[in-house]
From Swiss-Prot:
InterPro entries named among the record's database cross-references: DNA_mismatch_repair_CS, DNA_mismatch_repair_MutL, DNA_mismatch_S5_2-like, HATPase_C_sf, MutL/Mlh/PMS, MutL/Mlh/Pms-like, MutL_C, MutL_C_dimsub
Keywords: DNA damage, DNA repair
Name under which the protein is recorded: DNA mismatch repair protein MutL
Organism encoding this protein: Aliivibrio salmonicida (strain LFI1238)
Highest taxon in the source lineage: Bacteria
GO biological process assignments: mismatch repair
Amino acid sequence: MPIQILPARLANQIAAGEVVERPASVVKELVENSIDAGATRIDIDIEKGGSKLIRIRDNGSGIPKEELTLALSRHATSKITTLDDLEAIVSLGFRGEALASISSVSRLTLTSRTVAQEEAWSAHAEGRDMEVKLKPAAHPVGTTIDVVDLFFNTPARRKFLRTDKTEFTHIDELLKRIALSRLDITINLRHNGKSVRQYRAAQTKMQVEKRLAAVCGASFLQHALEVELEHGDLIFHGWISSPEGARAQGDVQYCYVNGRMMKDKLINHAIRQGYESSLSTNQYAAYILFIEINPHDVDVNVHPAKHEVRFHQARLVHDFIYQAIYGALQQAASLPEVTTTSDIEMDRESYFPPMKDYVRQSSLPLTDAHIENKSKQLKEAIEATPSYPNKASSDEWVSKAKPSMPKAYQSEKPSQRELNNYQHLLTTRDREDKTSNFEVNEVRIPKISEAKHNTVVVPQLKSAVSTSMLLGKVLSVVDKVFGLLQLGNQLQLVDLRYAEFIKSYGQLNSAHHEVLKAQPLLIPLSIGIDKDICNKLTEYQGILKQLGIDLKVKNNESLIVMAVCQPIRQQNLQQLIPNLLRYIYQINPSLDQVISWLSHQVQHDEACYSSAQAIQLVMELEQLWGNELSQFNNKLLKNIDITQAIQAFSHE
């Protein structure tokens, strides 16, 4: 068969194999075009799961009449013109393949009008050469695209479509992702003439929270922690669930890079690592995360469906995401068990369950016995309440409350948080207690008898990543091993290599109180060892187990490393484990000596630190040691006196 140029329709149908996988793929491409056109309202009409009709209507800028023909041509786009544009993409679409590919496997009609035009025009491509025909139409400013009879001319593709319900479910899930990425756009979805979803544009914080609840459910918002971290051109923000809000499946996991929805392996791995110590193997995190990065530092043209990206500094991005997730979870875990609200005054009667039938007001000071008696009455009343969930005991209901985001649209049933709030009213507070390290708004607690007519504002905690700094803010890295810190008006240098030692020592030192968690290696490591050491391995098992190190004897001269603790997981185990066993064999050390020895092995004299690594290291030190960190200040920190430098500036 001779080499020949393929007909336009056949070439487009081949391209459609990557672009148009199913009806949801069509919706994705067309809605993204609407977003790129600046639309603030997008209406989607679906019939029979998208196989019969997909109609996308927007109020964007529209397409001029003279460009309609080009719009249905392959590799025709208004979004890029040069290679520099391709390397700094800010739009969702850029290849110019979608409309041509879709029109080759369906009956597509494109109707559009710009502000400058008095009338709209409709374009339709058909025939072997995909010739475009134009005709006038009635249409407001914006664009409407009708995709009828998808895959009508490719029976092999059509028979692989699932049921209408399944295909529509994919479309619904897709629009959830888009609705989260652009909270400022109104999105309406109809199926077979019935309204299914209405996502209204969210401008205020309350509206944003309502959209989050509409997409992810109120249970997600109940356990949501708001995170935000910024470093140079890299910004990370969004919402993550606390461990208490973990799910049985990964159905609420949404991630975006520069507004583009992603299913990237590097990002997912960083998030999993951040949650590693917080969730069990059968639990899944829930999150809505946004990563904003300089377009020059990310390549989005690496996947047919644009679901994956390639970061120019992949390690930096990975560690940055891990640091934000891990830091937020650790700080949230250390917060007091106080319910938060975002300056919303909620009706007292709707916020707390009715208690007037079994709690009497008292003007006397509340003693411990009195509080215990009131708590007992509360439990008994709960047990007698028909609406109380049978799946939770009264002890659990009353005593447990986790930091969350209570909202007005939660279930009408009382929650653990609500009952705990009531119990908080019965607890007196020491006025001289100044140990809290977070800001709280003024709290006014009305008398129980006034509850029906009063409102209550409970303490408002800052975001989970906002914490009081013990060392200070990392400004930059000097000579690759020293971090420049600012704490108030004071500048300091921190030795990052010594900080690495302190971190490792702190992590390993917890072996005095509990067995360190052993993390299995993906591929068990076989290492050679002296016969004498191997024969005495059973004598060392106590210390090794306490440190989370799991070794199996293979034969008289080799071992298999099955698992190690997290602090040494990233080390060269091929060298570290034999050296550790040799050290134990030679001097028979105590657990404290082994911990000190291991901590020094983790310290790298030739290490080079980036700013992101320095920020992460400082944050981990603050979380690990807290106020006890001051004991290392002599070796860890050196003050910088900038007084002379300031005085040297003479402007007389």
